[in-house]
């Protein structure tokens, strides 16, 4: 009894003694902490699968692929063959592969379970034009994960972001000096743009009705604008980005590239497109960008102008157990770690629009975690 009393005293009277009443709760709490500690294993296992080409190997097999068939097809050291099953087991648990009955033997007389791809792994295939593999490789590159080791340091210093603390410069400056990161980032944005644009063009054609000119601000290599230009030949599309981004890019009949700075001036246009731009910037910076967009619309002398924003609208916190809500919170933390931006709920979006001088807005939640937001002067 004396030892138990001393234990309680040293732990500030917090009763951590296991008994029949609290053992389940305490062990459950321990398991929850362990799960959080090792969450990174999910993403790193997926990265490994991509680097080994597992999704494409299984898909190209054309039927359920047994563990022995997969192991033989992988470019690995044969001594590591027994570990493939363990990697695939966690990837199945994560929903990237599934097991189905597979015929084995020369005459197909036996049965064994084989791996097949799922909807999630279809988005990881190399030949899929909407593949998210470039985004995955970019986000899990050591340069992008390093800032998380400096998160607590950042909270205690005066740096604008953990990325600054980790690398000694801002994310955008680092990208302009490191071709590898710039290539990863541009490829990631282009792959995402193909997926998003296909949905927007299919489900939101009315958004572009009667539009004669559109400027894609921060449009990168022009994936979004070129798709819009092809789908709507009557729209004159302009990709507006930093001079070094668009310097060597060639336009077409109704597509051109213009270099500049969105904080200084945006080319005159009827419609401004901001895809995944404003979440990179804090509220003050975002208001500046929106004001420049409003000026561009005014200069066009066209009625019915607007800003089209493709970004997240963080859902109600009551949905905190939902995977979508958690993913939105992940993105918000990512913006905090890499840049000065954030993900916003509807109230925060509305304040931005009001502060920038806009009169009204409309949110259409058709892009999964993101929404299409139309903002009117």
Swiss-Prot record:
Highly expressed in lupulin glands. Detected in early-, mid- and late-stage cones. Pfam families: Dimerisation, Methyltransf_2. Keywords: Methyltransferase, S-adenosyl-L-methionine, Transferase. The keyword rRNA-binding does not apply. GO terms for biological process: methylation. Gene3D superfamilies: Vaccinia Virus protein VP39, Winged helix-like DNA-binding domain superfamily/Winged helix DNA-binding domain. The keyword Methyltransferase applies. Transmembrane segments: none annotated. Belongs to the class I-like SAM-binding methyltransferase superfamily. Cation-independent O-methyltransferase family. This is Probable O-methyltransferase 3. It comes from Humulus lupulus. The gene is OMT3.
């Amino acid at each position: 009894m004396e030892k138990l009393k001393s234990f309680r005293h040293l732990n500030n009277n917090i009763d951590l003694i296991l008994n029949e009443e609290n053992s389940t709760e305490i062990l459950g709490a321990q398991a929850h902490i362990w799960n959080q500690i090792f969450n990174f294993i999910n993403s790193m296992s997926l990265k490994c699968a991509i680097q080994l080409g597992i999704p494409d190997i299984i898909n190209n097999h054309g039927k359920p692929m047994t563990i022995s068939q997969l192991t033989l097809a992988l470019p690995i050291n044969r001594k590591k063959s027994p570990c493939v099953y363990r990697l695939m087991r966690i990837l199945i648990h994560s929903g990237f592969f599934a097991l189905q009955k597979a015929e084995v033997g020369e005459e197909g007389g036996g049965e064994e379970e084989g791996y097949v791809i799922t909807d999630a792994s279809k988005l990881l295939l190399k030949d899929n034009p909407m593949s998210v593999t470039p985004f995955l490789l970019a986000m899990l590159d050591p340069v992008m994960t390093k800032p998380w080791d400096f998160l607590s340091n950042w909270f205690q210093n005066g740096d604008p972001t953990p990325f600054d603390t980790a690398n000694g410069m801002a994310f955008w400056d680092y990208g302009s000096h490191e071709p590898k990161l710039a290539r990863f980032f541009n490829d990631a944005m282009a792959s995402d743009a193909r997926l998003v644009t296909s949905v927007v063009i299919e489900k939101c054609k009315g958004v572009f009705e009667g539009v004669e000119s559109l400027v894609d601000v921060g449009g990168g290599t022009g994936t979004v604008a070129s798709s819009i230009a092809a789908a709507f030949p009557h729209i004159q599309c302009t990709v507006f980005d930093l001079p070094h981004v668009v310097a060597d890019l060639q336009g077409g009949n109704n597509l051109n590239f213009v270099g500049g700075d969105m904080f200084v001036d945006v080319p005159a246009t009827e419609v401004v497109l901001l895809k995944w731009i404003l979440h990179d910037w804090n509220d003050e910076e975002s208001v500046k960008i929106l004001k420049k967009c409003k000026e561009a619309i005014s200069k066009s002398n066209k009625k019915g102008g607007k800003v089209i924003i493709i970004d997240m609208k963080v859902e109600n916190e009551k949905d905190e157990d939902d995977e979508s809500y958690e993913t939105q919170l992940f993105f918000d933390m990512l913006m905090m770690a890499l840049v000065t931006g954030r993900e916003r709920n509807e109230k925060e979006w509305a304040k931005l629009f009001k502060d920038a001088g806009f009169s009204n807005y409309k949110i259409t939640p058709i892009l999964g975690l993101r929404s299409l937001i139309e903002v009117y002067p």
